[in-house]
Amino acid sequence: MRTKIIAILLFANLTTSLNAQNHDKVGLLEKPVPVSSVKNITGFFGHRMEVNRDAYLKHFPIEKYVDFVVNRQHTAWDWTQAEQHGKWIESAYLSAVQSGDQELLAKAEAVLNRIIGSQEESGYVGATAKSFRSPERPVRGMDTYELYFVFHAFITVYEETGDKKALAAAEKLADYFLQYFGPGKLEFWPSKLRAPENKQKHLDGQSEFAGHSVHYSWEGTLLCDPVTRLYELTGKKKYLDWSQWVVSNIDKWSGWDAFSRLDSVADGTLGVDKLQPYVHSHTFHMNFMGFLRLYRITGDKSLLRKVAGAWDDIHERQMYITGGVSVAEHYEHDYVKPLSGNIVETCATMSWMQLTQQLLELTGESKYADAMERLMINHVFAAQDCENGVCRYHTAPNGSKPDGYFHGPDCCTASGHRIISMLPTFIYAEKGKEFYVNQYMPSQYNGKDFAFSITGNYPESENMELVIESEKAKNKTINLRIPSWCENPKVSVNGEAVADIKPGTYLKLSRKWGKGDKINIIFPMEEKWISRSHHSKYISYRLPGGEVMYKEEPADKIPYAFVRGPIVYSLDMVWNKQLCNDDVDMEQDMRMNVTSKPTAINKPRKDMLGPVYQAKALYKGSEVDVVLTPFANIGQWFRPDGVKPQKNADAFTYAIWLYKAE
């Protein structure tokens, strides 16, 4: 039976995934390959994906959360229990299909069938009690957010397996919302205020149908994303009409003309943080993905312009050196990016990665793949506990551990396993005879008529080799992403050097590729200390609803970070036992010699990302040697040869940004 299912998966990936674009006016320039075609991911990333699959997804108590949904007695505001099943189903299916894990696939099918089996005749499949719901109040305030992920789980299962009951369940759920919300029906107002009384009003508290009031309706309107995805698959105009109705009312519901003013963000005259009093990163990303789907469907270029302009603004002002985004869950003014505290939310990491991937698919601009590489290499796995696979809520550039790794389950633990499960879908893409290598994870690609492997353990190694494994020769143009950070890339085909390689573009290699053909790739990585731009002293304050915001004051000194190509390093006390103080105050007591080049040393553990360096520093005024490790490794929250600290302890400090010795 399991063999039959895997065969169905492989077949479905060649068919159902094509249907998504049948109803779009704008085709993708890069179409992701089926997840089942990406195999044998190795190295640090492959190991951490295995941790996600075997240590976390398989042992997560999903039955408890399925019971919670199936029993349907929830009336409270809390959303953390009711979003687990949607994210878990999608993660489990993607991980099982990609790896061929039949045990996990069987478990995922059983969970899916229980959820679909519990769906009410009306189409509702959330956790809210029937006694709570009525025609005047068909959902709880956080149902829209929770069910966003259930929608996507059902649709992903259909696209990856061809399981029609999953698509039918998604349609029934959409029809439930269409029955109660729409022109002349209920709307996604963030408070009891209505237009025009709601114009430019500062909100807090909770809304009936649109989540937190401080999100100004965007936590309800985010359903434009999965419902437009349904239209792409089914061509049923009611889903397109409803999504357009939702987006057309954001200005009115928000009270701040937040949708229209995205044009000013695209013009460069307004920061994305100024759209309304509080711009929640994750929520905006989810809406942006819906806008991009509407662009694909309708061809309305203003939608692409709005989203691309917002992305550019965030990338320029609000993206951290690691590729992560969000300051206490939101976007701040100017270049305000504190180094510690509730910084870089895992939910925002997930949706920023997805949003960036969608822009890459639509535009073919390699800058988006560059941004994804930085995030994937540095921050995605920094948030993951190396042993059990649980992901942090926030993972600040400077902080302490293991406190922060052990919490939930909540939104961020679930977003963490979801984005890790999605990573294989971001590596390769194709369109006709064009094939794109966007990320250089050591792996194999086995497509319908084209196959190859990439070896070399990038980014730990600068050298990679792509070897064609297709049995039959095939005319293809292989597009290699040449990272913008790499000044002197080198590529050769069967030993012959390729000329005119430009960083920040794709290198096109067109020929009839036969079995055994080799592409050798070298991305030399510069090792250097860099000073932090736009650094300030940050002072926090709170909005009436408790949301943390920041002011800035001039700083009297500027910190530095060590980088090697796209890899960002940290001074992590787990690997610096020689200082005899595991919770070193990095800001007060550590000063780095940034004029001395760190030297490469052996890795303390084989399963960590390298290379590892030894650097010169002053600790409390005394000269010391310290070990610098890639930031991605901070999920190692205990010393391998030591006693594990309490899970809520601030046992070990770490820091990317360090002050220099004077």
Label every model-predicted segment.
Residues 1-22:
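Bacterial Sec-dependent N-terminal signal peptides
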Residues 22-102, 106, 135-160, 202-213, ...:
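Aromatic (Trp/Tyr) and acidic
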Residues 88, 102-138, 168, 318-326:
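Helix-terminus loop motifs that line ligand-binding clefts
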Residues 95, 108-111, 115, 157, ...:
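Alpha-helical solenoid scaffolds that mediate protein-protein interactions
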Residues 116-120, 162, 178-183, 235, ...:
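Helix-capping and short linker residues that terminate individual alpha-solenoid repeat units
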Residues 243, 307, 369-378, 383-467, ...:
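C-terminal beta-rich recognition modules with glycine/proline-rich loops and embedded aromatic residues
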Residues 476-479, 491, 509-524:
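C-terminal beta-strand-rich structural cap/linker in extracellular carbohydrate-active enzymes
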Residues 486-510, 529-537:
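Solvent-exposed beta-strand/loop surfaces of large extracellular or lumenal domains
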